[in-house]
Amino acid sequence: MDYDEIIKTRYSVRKYSEEPVEQDKLNKILQAGRIAPTAGNRQPQRIIVIENEEAFEKIKQCTPCHFNAPLLLLVCYDKSVENNNHYGDKRPYGQVDASIVLTHMMLEAQNLELGTVWVGLFNPALLREYFHIPNNYEILGLMPIGYPDMDAIPSKMHSEKFLIDHTVFYNSF
């Protein structure tokens, strides 16, 4: 798939088939996240692969938005390495970096004809407890992954995009 096709056809999948995701495809998705750019190349992303029944039972207690996907990535970032101090910049970039990583993985999944959705609705305290997430790790989001069900369709809001002149300005607002 070429890049234009990837970004134009991707949508948030909320209904998955039971077909498992092949390990080689998961590896490609994780590799896309590994090589994603991060501020100062600090690489604060930390990813838990949720793939077995026991882990999914825990996920189901943490969010209603698992959509019965056969695979799910729990994306965190390590706050102790999130700063880019190379040029005296003290701003924390962990959330931005982990978002870039998650987006790269999402686009690679689309390239592999897998569906995804970025989930921000979850109970962080339960996730932290159930998956032993250290205190210095911040939870960014969940990404269910799988083959879209035969009747999966984009939500009504998917195609509602602003015109470019509503969001892009040249040289000043």
Question: What does each model-identified segment do?
Answer:
Residues 3-20, 25, 89, 142-173:
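C-terminal helix-cap and adjacent tail motif
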Residues 77, 121, 147:
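Short secondary-structure boundary segments
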Residues 119-136:
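Active-site helix/loop module of the DD-peptidase/beta-lactamase fold
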